[in-house]
C-alpha cells in the first residue's frame, strides 16, 4: 500500500517536472518569436512614418507617436499598407520578393497563436520527450512544435526583417516598372 502511494507521489512529481520543462520551453519560444515580430512591427512603423511624412520632422513625430504606434493601428493593418506601398512604388522589388513578403501573413498567424494559446500539458504532452516539441492548444490542434520547426519560423521572420531593411533603403526612390518589349 505504501509503495503504491510512493509510486503515485513519484509519478506526480515527474509530471510536475515535465510540465515545468514544457512551460520553460514555451516561454523560450514565445519570448524569442514575439520579440522578433515586435522588432518587425517597429521597423514597419518607421517605414510608414518615413513614407508618409518625408520632409517635416514635427509631422513625423506626431504620426509615429499618435498614429502608427497606437493600438488601433494593428500590425496586420501596418502590414497591409506596407504591401500596397511596395506593390505600387517598388514593383520590381515586389516581383523579386513576393514570396518572402507574402509569408508575412503566416508569421502573424503563428505569432498570434503562440501569444494567445495555452501550452499543452495533457498527459500525452507530459509523457512526450521535450525534444519532440511543445504543443500550443490553438496551433494546429496542439501538434507539437519542434526546435527545427521553430527555427524555420525564425528564419521566415528574419527574411521579413531583411526585406524591411531593403525597403528602408528604397524609400527615397520610386521604381518605374520597365515595359517588356513585344
Stretches with model-predicted labels:
Residues 82-97:
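Short, solvent-exposed, charged loop/turn and helix-capping segments
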Residues 140-157:
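Short, flexible active-site recognition loops that position polar ligands and cofactors
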Residues 12, 19, 26, 89-90, ...:
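Generic signal for short, ordered secondary-structure residues
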Residues 94, 98-108, 147:
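Short, well-ordered coil↔helix boundary/capping segments
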Residues 127-144:
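Short secondary-structure subsegments characteristic of cysteine-rich extracellular domains
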Residues 79-80, 132-133, 148, 155:
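Intrinsic disorder/low-complexity segments enriched in polar/small residues
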Residues 2-84, 102-109, 113-124, 156-180:
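Amphipathic alpha-helical interface elements
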Residues 23-30, 94-97, 150:
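Active-site oxyanion-binding pockets that recognize sulfate/phosphate
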Amino acid at each position: 500500500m505504501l509503495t503504491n502511494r510512493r509510486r503515485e507521489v513519484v509519478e506526480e512529481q515527474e509530471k510536475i517536472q515535465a510540465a515545468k520543462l514544457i512551460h520553460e520551453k514555451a516561454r523560450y519560444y514565445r519570448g524569442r518569436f514575439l520579440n522578433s515580430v515586435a522588432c518587425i512591427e517597429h521597423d514597419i512603423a518607421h517605414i510608414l512614418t518615413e513614407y508618409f511624412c518625408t520632409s517635416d520632422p514635427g509631422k513625423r513625430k506626431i504620426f509615429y507617436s499618435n498614429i502608427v504606434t497606437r493600438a488601433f493601428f494593428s500590425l496586420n493593418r501596418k502590414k497591409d499598407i506596407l504591401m500596397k506601398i511596395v506593390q505600387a512604388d517598388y514593383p520590381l522589388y515586389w516581383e523579386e520578393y513576393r514570396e518572402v513578403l507574402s509569408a508575412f501573413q503566416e508569421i502573424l498567424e503563428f505569432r498570434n497563436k503562440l501569444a494567445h494559446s495555452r501550452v499543452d500539458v495533457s498527459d500525452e504532452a507530459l509523457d512526450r520527450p521535450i525534444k519532440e516539441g511543445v504543443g500550443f492548444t490553438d496551433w494546429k490542434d496542439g501538434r507539437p512544435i519542434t526546435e527545427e520547426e521553430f527555427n524555420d519560423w525564425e528564419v521566415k521572420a528574419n527574411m521579413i526583417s531583411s526585406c524591411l531593411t531593403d525597403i528602408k533603403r528604397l524609400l527615397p526612390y520610386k521604381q518605374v516598372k520597365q515595359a517588356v518589349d513585344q
